[in-house]
Amino acid sequence: MSHQEQLHKPNRQQFSEKQFIAFAFNYVAGFGFISVVLTMFKLGPFSYLILGLAALGILGVMLSFSRLSIICGSKAYGGSYLIAKKALGVKTITARFFTFLSGWNVSLTGPFNGLIVPAVLVLSFADIKAVKDNNGALIGLLVGGFVLFGALNFISLFGLKMNKNAILFFAIVKWVVVLGGLILGIYLIGTNHGHGFVENNTLGEHIEDLSFLKVISTTVGMLVAFAGTEDLTAITPDVKSKNIRKCFLLMFGAVTLLYLIGFVIISGISGLNGYGLDGKEKNEKAINTFGSIYFQAGGKYLGIPLLVIFGLGFLLNSLASRLGMTITTARKYVALAQDGFLPSFINEQNKHHEYHKAVWASNIMTLAVMVLMIIVPFLPNDENPGKQLVMFDAISVLVEVAIELAVLISLIQYFITYIFFFMILAKKEGSASVSWWEIASYGVSFAIITVLLFVNLFPITAWKNTNTFKLSILAAFFALGIGFFIHSEIKHKGQLVKSVECN
């Protein structure tokens, strides 16, 4: 099929409203929350402030994206890329450049989030000392993660129908494990007579000193729990719905409610923050990860078997997320290819009606990120100069840096999308029905996003080697994108290939 036929081929809508809400809920909720929630209580009762700030920031983003889905419609792939086209147009090279940059930036979130899959096996078994201290076991788990990543690449080529079935299977197991952890958390609360509610909601001896930077860094961490909002706007053409805004808002409400319930339950567990159940000194009964809940609830005989079950569920969570990322990231590349910014073959579909070459492009980018991130363990140790990190700690730092990069890219996208959104509203397009509370939420959210972005781009603490590495990686990938843009300008002589645009 020719490029033009591919470009104008009618889109097969493969998600019903209910399926999309379920897909979106599973895509956003789960992995990020259980990865960061235990760190929230280092600030005691102010942890609820962190949850509130993160939720307010993302609520405004969600409302703006859902509002823009009404203004721009849902006939074409691209999400926030289409928003940039609507705000700036494509008549000048400057407008085309910033429009492309918006689309390129949002396409980077998937590859950086995808890095977590191979490492998640290692972190899942952190409470088993024989694994944590065994380099051979750690390498084996990492290799296993890469093999699973390759298997996911193969599955993702079989189209949304196949992917939906795979994601459903992974999601069922994932939620059994996540909800099982919360139930076991309630059991641990009972065994300690609810002492954790006092321990985690007061500024006790082991709670970190409250400061502006602590609040900012912890809020950024909490944003991981809501990651993926910007990705979902890229696949709206695959959704059969007359009110995509309602779908987004229902999903956000469900995610926030789940997090609030989970937050309350976990705040009642003793032994958080790396300290034992006595709260006096670090020991083996500390709740270091979500998996520790399984480990401690299982006791002497069932602790390791339950931890293995958690590890498998945590892995399936990552597999489901990776499949979802492949779907959304591929469609971001499709939008750029349709306009000629990327090679036209990326827009081709296979017999399963999947953009298979866009899927390969997504996977190649993820592999490139993985290769570059291998540098992280070999960076100079900021804590102990001249001393190399042990393998487990090095992997932990690698995952931490990858998460920080993914959040940073998301913050950049939220910031520039808000700028474009305000430009569109200034033109009085679709703004007649915007209520005052919605406008207020945009203002509060934009302020939160702006502070989080610039404090993380230019931290006012001691500069670390990982800060230099993060900025270098961002510069490298943006340079690659600029290369594609320059090639497109030369090839198409400053004209975009005709494609579907915002209404």
UniProtKB/Swiss-Prot annotation:
Which parts pass through the membrane? 20-40, 43-63, 106-126, 138-158, 166-186, 215-235, 249-269, 301-321, 359-379, 405-425, 443-463, 468-488
As for subcellular location, the record says: Cell membrane
Gene3D superfamilies assigned to the protein according to its UniProt record, in alphabetical order: Amino acid/polyamine transporter I
Q: Does the keyword Cell membrane apply?
A: yes
Report the superkingdom from the record. Bacteria
Gene Ontology cellular component terms for the protein in this record: plasma membrane
What Pfam families does UniProt report for this protein, alphabetically?
AA_permease
Entry's family note: To M.genitalium MG225.
Alphabetical UniProt keywords? Cell membrane, Membrane, Transmembrane, Transmembrane helix
Q: Keyword DNA repair, does the record have it?
A: no
Q: Which InterPro entries match?
A: AA-permease/SLC12A_dom, APC_superfamily
Q: What is the protein name stated in its UniProt record?
A: Uncharacterized protein MG226 homolog
Q: Which organism is it from?
A: Mycoplasma pneumoniae (strain ATCC 29342 / M129 / Subtype 1) (Mycoplasmoides pneumoniae)
- How does the entry describe its membrane topology? Multi-pass membrane protein
One example of a Gene Ontology biological process annotation: transmembrane transport
